[in-house]
Amino acid sequence: MSSEPSTTGTSPRTPRPGAQKSSGAVTKKGDRAAKDKTASTLPPVGEDEPKNPEEYQCTGVLETDFAELCTRSGYVDFPKVVTRPRVQQSSVPSASTSEKPVLDDQRPSASCSQSSLESKYVFFRPTIQVELEQEDSKAVKEIYIRGWKVEDRILGIFSKCLPSLSQLQAINLWKVGLTDKTLTTFIALLPLCSSTLRKVSLEGNPIPEQSFSKLMGLDSTIVHLSLRNNNINDHGAQLLGQALSTLQNSNRTLVSLNLAFNHIGDVGAGYIADGLRLNRSLLWLSLAHNHIQDKGALKLAEVLRPFELTHREVVERRRLLLVKGTQERSRSPSSSRYGDSKAEREKSQTLGISNVTLVDKQEKMQSLKAPKTISKKKEKTGEVVKKEEKLGSGQSPTQGTPKKEDAAKAGKGKVTIPEQKMSKGKATKMGAKEKRSILLESEQLVVEATEMVNPLLEPVEHRDGKVFLPGNKVLLHLNLLRNQITEVGLEGFLTAVQYQVQVSKPKTSPKAPLGLLWLSLAKNCFDPQCPTHVMIQELMLPRDPVKAKAREEEAAAT
C-alpha cells in the first residue's frame, strides 16, 4: 500500500515525453514567426529607390501620365481619366418587354445586385473626361471636369502632364469649387500648355474676389472664354471691362466672351460698354439672363454708333498722333538711313564724305553741270552727306544695288516690303506644309494688322466742338436675351442698327468690318410685336448669315 502513493506522487514530477515535444514545437513556431517577421520588414529588391514625380517624363498619354504622377505624389484615391460619353438617342422600350413580370428565379442574386449597385454609383465618382482626336485615338482634344472640387494638388499634377498634350484645344471646368488661389494656379499653368489651347470654360464657379479678369491679361492666348453662372456682379463686370480695353492697352486675342446667367446690372453693362469702346478683337458677346435695364442697354447701344470722345481720350489721341507723325518723319526717304544700324550709318557717312571730297576736287579740275546744288550742299554739312549719297548712288551701277537694300531695310514694318521678301526669298524654301498654311497665316496677319491700329487713330468727325469716333463695327454677335429692357432701350439699338446698316452698304473693301450681324433682344420687358422691335428685326434679317444661307439654299433648290 505504501508503494501506490509513491508511484502516484512521483508521476506528476517526471516530465512526459509528449510534453517535451509540444514545447519544442512551440519554440520552433516562435522562431519561424520571428524569421518571417524580420523577412517581411526587409524591403524588396528594386523598391528601395524613391519615386520622384519630378523625374518622370510624360509620354503624352493623359491616362498613363496622370495615374503615374498621382502614384508618385502619394495620391492613392485619385480620379480616373475616361473618355467622355457621346450623347445617344434613348430608345423607347416596347410594350411587350415592359409589361413582362419579373419572376423570382429571374431576379439577380445578392452578389449581382451589389455589383450592379456599385456600377451605378461609379457615375458619381470623380473622373476626368476627355475627348479624343478622331485621327489619333490617344491624342486628347478637350478636357471636362464636372462636379468635384479641384485642389492645388490636382492642379500641380496638371501642370506636369498637360504640357505634353500637343493637340489640347479646350479645358472645361464646371462646378469644381474654384477659389481665388486655385484660379491663380490654373491661370499660371495655361502658358505651359500647347499653343493649340484656345478655349477655356469656367462655369458654376462663383469666386467672391471676382478675379476672372486675370484670364484676359495682355499675355493671354485665350480666344474663347465662357464665364456663365459665376455670380459675376457689377464689380466683376468692371474688372472684365478694364481687361477688354483701357486707354493704354486692350485685349487683342479674345474673340468670344460668354457672361450669361450672372448678376450684371446697368452699372456693370456700362463698364462692359466702356471696354468695347477701344476693343477691336471681340466678335461675340453674350449678356443673356442678367439684370440689365434701359440705362445699361443705352450704354451698349451707344458703342455701336459714333460716340463722343472723353477729355482723356482726346488727349491720348493727340499724343498718339504726335508719335505717329514723328515715326513717319523718321521713316521718310531722306532720313531712312537713320533707322539702320550704327555700323551702316557710319559707313554711309564715310561714303558721303568721300563723295564730297571727290566733288571738291572735280570742281577745281572742271566745272560741273549743277553748281548751284553743290554750293548749297557746302552750306549745310548734314544735307551734303544725304544728297551726295544719293548722287553717288545714282552715278554708278555698283552703288545702285546697296540703295535698294537700304530702301528694303528702311521699309521694314510696311505691308508691301514683307510681301516682296516672301515672294523672293522664301518662295524657294517653302515646304508643302508651309504652302498649305500660307492662307491661314496671311489671314492672321491681316487680323493682327487691323488690331494693331489704335482705334483712337481712326478717322473722326468734329461736330459742335466735339470729337466723335466711329462706333465699334467689329462686334458681330450680341445676345441680350432675358434681361429687363423696355422700349426705351430698344430705341437706342434701333438707332445703332440703322447706322451700321447704312455704313456697311458700300463694300469698298472685303477686309472691312461688317458690323453687327446678329442681335437678340427677345424675352425682355416689351411687346415682341412693338414697332421698334419689328423694325430692328427687319433690318437685321438680311444681315444674319445663317438665315441668308438658308434662303440661298431654298432659292437654289427651287
Curated annotation (Swiss-Prot):
Q: Where is the composition biased (Low complexity)?
A: 1-18
Q: Where does this protein have compositionally biased stretches of type Polar residues? A: 86-99
From start to end residue, where is composition biased (Basic and acidic residues)? 28-38, 339-348, 380-391
Q: Which InterPro entries match?
A: Leu-rich_rpt (IPR001611), LRR-containing_protein_71 (IPR053040), LRR_dom_sf (IPR032675)
Q: Where are the LRR repeats?
A: 196-216, 221-241, 253-274, 281-302
Q: Where is this region: Disordered?
A: 1-55, 86-112, 325-415
Q: Does the keyword Zinc-finger apply?
A: no
UniProt KW keywords: Leucine-rich repeat, Repeat
Recorded superkingdom: Eukaryota
Record protein name field? Leucine-rich repeat-containing protein 71
Species, as recorded: Mus musculus (Mouse)
Instruction: Give me the gene this protein comes from.
Output: Lrrc71
